[in-house]
């Protein structure tokens, strides 16, 4: 009886299989890479969504404290320095807790603190276009839900002496719709007469314009919202109609 066992390793009887220990090392190394990558991504998300929000919240607290102090002492700065607070923004559609100090400037350093006013555009309540940029997904994401704004929605600004109520709507006499999606290079949305080709045209209306990145987590486009000033009242007269029932705290 022939008890010869055929070789198992190929034509020449050589076994080419790698040692089990080698595969374990490969699998372990790959697993460690995935774990490390996952931790890096997690830390990035924590930084983007939590830490940036923490720093902005701290900055907002400092801004409102300074602004309230200046207002209490009758201080109005005609040409506010970059990064300083100029007005308090409230949007009823976003709820009674929504409040942000708008800062002067739109640089990275400015927008870390909160929504920023484009220098060179009108100031709150003035004739022209008070244009404001803001983040949608980081630094407390003040414009996260900007896409939810609808025609007829009120937007309220608080200055030292007045309540300014703007109403989201198409801008008469222009092609500017109340909500638009444009390219990042389309700066005409912030002109005194928005969406016109001539930046030197003098404005005749009191406009508010918001700009932010679109879609969320992308800078491929800009989402724009326009509004018109529809009411201006002294703060001594009490809260404006749009804020009826509000109990204002902090900002």
Regions found by a protein language model. Name each.
Residues 1-63:
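N-terminal membrane-targeting segments
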Residues 58-76:
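Short extracytoplasmic/periplasmic juxtamembrane "stem" segments immediately C-terminal to an N-terminal membrane anchor
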Residues 94-97, 161:
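Glycine-centered tight beta-turn/hairpin loop motif at sheet-sheet or coil-to-beta transitions
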Residues 96-148:
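Structured, soluble extracytoplasmic/luminal domains of envelope-associated proteins
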Residues 130, 137-251:
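Extracytoplasmic/periplasmic soluble domains downstream of a signal peptide or transmembrane helix
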């Amino acid at each position: 009886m022939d008890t010869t066992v055929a070789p198992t390793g190929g034509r020449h009887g050589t076994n080419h299989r790698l040692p089990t220990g080698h595969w374990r090392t490969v699998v372990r190394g790959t697993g460690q890479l995935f774990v490390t990558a996952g931790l890096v991504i997690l830390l990035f998300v924590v930084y983007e969504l939590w830490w940036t929000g923490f720093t902005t919240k701290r900055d907002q607290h400092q801004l409102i404290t300074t602004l309230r102090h200046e207002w209490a002492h009758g201080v109005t700065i005609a040409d506010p320095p970059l990064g300083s607070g100029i007005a308090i923004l409230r949007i009823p559609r976003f709820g009674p807790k929504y409040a942000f100090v708008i800062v002067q400037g739109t640089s990275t350093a400015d927008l870390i603190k909160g929504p920023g006013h484009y220098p060179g555009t009108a100031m709150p309540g003035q004739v022209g276009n008070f244009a404001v940029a803001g983040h949608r997904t980081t630094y407390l994401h003040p414009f996260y839900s900007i896409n939810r704004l609808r025609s007829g929605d009120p937007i309220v600004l608080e200055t030292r002496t007045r309540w300014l109520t703007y109403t989201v709507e198409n801008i008469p006499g222009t092609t500017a719709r109340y909500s638009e999606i444009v390219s990042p290079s389309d700066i005409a949305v912030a002109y005194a007469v928005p969406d016109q080709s001539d930046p030197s045209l003098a404005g005749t209306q009191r406009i508010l314009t918001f700009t932010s990145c679109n879609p969320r987590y992308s800078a491929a486009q800009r989402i724009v919202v326009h509004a018109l000033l529809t009411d201006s009242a002294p703060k001594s007269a009490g809260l404006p109609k749009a804020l009826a029932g509000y109990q204002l705290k902090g900002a």
